[in-house]
Amino acid sequence: MSQTNSHAQAGGTAKPIGLLIAAVGVVYGDIGTSPLYTLKEVFQGGYGVEVTHDAILGVLSLIFWSLIWVVSFKYMAFVLRADNQGEGGIMALMALARRASAKHPKLQMMMVVFGLFGAALFYGDSMITPAVSVLSAMEGLELAFDGLDHWIVPMALVVLVGLFLIQRHGTARIGVLFGPVMVVWFLVLGALGVYGIMQSPEVLKAVNPAWGLNFFIIHPGIGVAILGAVVLALTGAEALYADMGHFGRKPISRAWFILVLPALLLNYFGQGALVLGNPETVRNPFYLLAPSWALLPLIGLSTMATIIASQAVISGAFSMTLQAIQLGYIPRMHIQHTSSDAQGQIYIGAVNWALMVGVIMLVIGFESSGALASAYGVAVTGTMLCTTILVSTVMLMLWKWPPLLAVPLLICLLLVDGLFFAANVPKIFQGGAFPVLAGAVLFILMTTWKRGKHLLAERIDEGGLPLPIFIGSIRVQPPHRVQGTAVFLTARSDAVPHALLHNMLHNQVLHEQVVLLTVVYEDTPRVPSAQRFEVESYGEGFYRVILHFGFIDEPDVPAALALCHLAELDFSPMRTTYFLSRETVIPSKMDGMARWREALFAFMLKNANGNLRFFKLPFNRVIELGTQVEM
């Protein structure tokens, strides 16, 4: 997604066809590379499905109607409408659902749990997608050259490591190629599909849902389980919603119905026709669908497509991390902007290296796309289920849809998502434990950070000196005042910041203008400049300033304070000093969190990026004072 924000900013003036091509290059990379492995996994994934006429048509019918129901119906008709001021993605949706359930604290807490768990699974997906996609592309070399089996993993690792190494430099320059390359990819998918269908046109009968129902009848023991492989055709569906803020709902929908959906369906049916005529081709129906002379060019194109798909989820992880930081669920990290033109193009080193290590472990541990497919479905279906639950809350409590209309619809949506998720639960014991464990660890980290910050604020507030009493004492015994403005960052509005008390204690002076600054993040993506600040005067040169930012805004505090000249406050750069407080947590037996979580929070707090960099404060105008807090 880092390559997409330039499109977002130009979205108002970009030609529709250009925006559509750009959307194809970013939004549909993941779901567009699913034909590489989906049908092969159904018949080769150990489900016990025999390659028969009825089984092939049954599986194709399930794939067809899954794409129609989940993507064309659920996402296009409903999920994409649940935008948070134009922004999509599970964190934005969680903020929307949290706002919708504000009057019901228990329900609101449940929305946060589902949102955080869905986000945690997305990080697991961000590791699995590059691994399974690039491996599946490289596996085509086994058909082109004998004896290359042992080189597939090393070559995939070279491509993937190279992809992660270039992240810090940004992808703006090569990003302009993503759209055209993916358009060519989908055209090739469609052409190969038509080529296959022409050999066995009867495969088109699978459009009839009766074939899908018949599959469940003739395979009663594995009917639901096979949905765990069919769902691979839906991987990347969440990207349609996550990237909505970059392109808008209409370009994403048009790209789906005009190009992506027809190309995918043609290719799946073409693969089915190939296997119908020659069951032995089930070992790799995607590549065997191509004429022998086109195999090497197709491998090259597949590799480019999977790199683009991988780039999309990596950039998506960066974007979601930024949102989670702003919403207070992840410690602050160093965020590097990789483009001077597009504000949203970012790189987060800690996330990049963590993803790279995870991807390397997956490739070495699983060694093939087929083995990795079992891990894929759990992350995908878990995130989709969480999204549906959050959208349900928005439909009923924010949009105020009539229950008689909404409830039956939501039951159907949840039933289908629940079936897909249930089909993948057994995979937890067959390699699918990785995304679940990764999701559980990340969920613990996020909830520990959020709870820890809340407890830390409570401990700091205990015994705090009320601001009116402090200002009253200054009136009685005025301290020496020096020229300039002192800005003290604080989370509370009714108590004196510790940094201010320490400064008074050690320096015995006050600035002529003292500003108690609180930064507040809203549940909306952006806050207009006109609503950026609130100012309140307490007298004696004391002011309360509250700055409001959205969860995708860049929190540039000096720039925001410059707007306060409208309230006759002076924030001249060379006359303003920023005072920060740096807390060190000491775990104790006090009530709050388990000791191990307190220790974990203390470690996270110690290694978190400080306010100085995060708020873009000038290095030479900052004084940081430390304090120890028992928890």
UniProtKB/Swiss-Prot annotation:
Recorded superkingdom:
Bacteria
Q: Where in the cell is it found?
A: Cell inner membrane
Bilayer topology: Multi-pass membrane protein
| UniProt KW Zinc-finger keyword | no
Residue ranges of the TM segments? 17-37, 56-76, 109-129, 147-167, 174-194, 215-235, 256-276, 288-308, 346-366, 378-398, 403-423, 428-448
Q: Which UniProt keywords apply?
A: Cell inner membrane, Cell membrane, Ion transport, Membrane, Potassium, Potassium transport, Symport, Transmembrane, Transmembrane helix, Transport
Major place of localization?
membrane
Function noted in UniProt: Transport of potassium into the cell. Likely operates as a K(+):H(+) symporter.
Q: Which HAMAP family match?
A: Kup (MF_01522)
Q: Which family does it belong to?
A: Belongs to the HAK/KUP transporter (TC 2.A.72) family.
Q: Give the protein's recorded name.
A: Probable potassium transport system protein Kup
Organism, scientific name: Pseudomonas syringae pv. tomato (strain ATCC BAA-871 / DC3000)
